[in-house]
Amino acid sequence: MAATVNLELDPIFLKALGFLHSKSKDSAEKLKALLDESLARGIDSSYRPSQKDVEPPKISSTKNISIKQEPKISSSLPSGNNNGKVLTTEKVKKEAEKRPADKMKSDITEGVDIPKKPRLEKPETQSSPITVQTSKDLAMADLSSFEETSADDFAMEMGLACVVCRQMMVASGNQLVECQECHNLYHRDCHKPQVTDKEANDPRLVWYCARCTRQMKRMAQKTQKPPQKPAPAVVSVTPAVKDPLVKKPETKLKQETTFLAFKRTEVKTSTVISGNSSSASVSSSVTSGLTGWAAFAAKTSSAGPSTAKLSSTTQNSTGKPATSSANQKPVGLTGLATSSKGGIGSKIGSNNSTTPTVPLKPPPPLTLGKTGLSRSVSCDNVSKVGLPSPSSLVPGNSSQLSGNGNTGTSGPSGSTTSKTTSESSSSPSASLKGPTSQESQLNAMKRLQMVKKKAAQKKLKK
């Protein structure tokens, strides 16, 4: 480049240098004329744009010089003024560039004018070669280095090259394979272990590099180990704490089914119409139909009638001996015996006609029909039958009342036999129906205590 430019532009450069460094007033006009000649000839048209692009800052300095020195010329040539200024700057730059090559000529031309004009020209001549050299040299160095390294670096930055060999070359059996986890590219041969054809070509498979597979295995092991240790502990602790709480209520429920607190069963009532004592038998059968809490309340209220019954029996023992009901078979006896098949034994206690103090219709005891509560009073003439049993169906064993209330019940011998039969009949019924209300209350208290103890133990453990 430099040699060809020197051959073409030597005379113009010499003239331009002479005009620039001369002290005469005509130098500016001569420079302008030279510029017009070069424009007319069209020489160096290919070289101008590159110089314009490389060094625009010199335009301002030459503009100032040309405006100061040539106000007349610039006014006379308004159309070509801008082009003239640009071309003069180009000439100055060209001269500065060719100075090292043409030292002899420049020294001869400058020898006369250097002491007179050092301030105006030297800053331009010193600064221009520095800027031109740096821009050109740096540009060339950057281009060469960019051509050598930019492709690889760009490929690495964009993630288009192999991470191992840092190259983008792809062969038929050595394609670039991308890891789905870290998105790094590997040649099939560069990766260890080498990628198989199936892994590289099958689109259904997801390929991971060796480093990512190791990391994923470690993470999987870490995530699997912690739940394995506490899981058995939780399983072992929960049954120990919860099993007694879960199982015991089940057993309690089984026990409670035998004692239904809020269930009211409708039992067939034995309606016996036998003279004056019909109301007593009906009331006793109605009260005996209660079960659960109602029967428990009836039990508590039975204390009063039992005392009345005691007094009546003592007076009966002092009175006249009564005829046995086994010999007398009144009309109402068979009806009572058959009615006892309905599930309730009727209990009617009446006194002798000779005892004036005791009323003919004593209040019926409320404990009738209650299992486990058929306890006979000492030497009384009242028979208590809990459930329909074969012994209660026999008319000779159970003492019943006839229509008037005048005939008395059996004596001590008859009462004892009735007691034994009633006890024997009540014992299977008690075993069938399970615990009484008192026992169920005790069981409930025990359960409450157990629950409280367990709650306290849980609090202590926490």
From Swiss-Prot:
Keywords: Isopeptide bond, Metal-binding, Nucleus, Phosphoprotein, Ubl conjugation, Zinc, Zinc-finger. Residues 347-358, 396-437 have a biased composition (Low complexity). Dephosphorylated at Ser-128 by the PNUTS-PP1 complex, promoting RNA polymerase II transcription pause-release. It holds the Pfam family PHD. A zinc finger (PHD-type) spans 159-215. The keyword Electron transport does not apply. Its main location: nucleus. One of its GO terms (molecular function) is zinc ion binding. The keyword Iron-sulfur does not apply. Signal peptide: none annotated. GO terms for biological process: RNA polymerase II transcription initiation surveillance; snRNA 3'-end processing. It is found in: Nucleus. InterPro entries: Int12_PHD, Integrator_subunit_12, Zinc_finger_PHD-type_CS, Znf_FYVE_PHD, Znf_PHD, Znf_PHD-finger, Znf_RING/FYVE/PHD. Belongs to the Integrator subunit 12 family. Component of the Integrator complex, composed of core subunits INTS1, INTS2, INTS3, INTS4, INTS5, INTS6, INTS7, INTS8, INTS9/RC74, INTS10, INTS11/CPSF3L, INTS12, INTS13, INTS14 and INTS15. The core complex associates with protein phosphatase 2A subunits PPP2CA and PPP2R1A, to form the Integrator-PP2A (INTAC) complex. Component of the integrator complex, a multiprotein complex that terminates RNA polymerase II (Pol II) transcription in the promoter-proximal region of genes. This is Integrator complex subunit 12. The lineage of its organism: Eukaryota, Metazoa, Chordata, Craniata, Vertebrata.
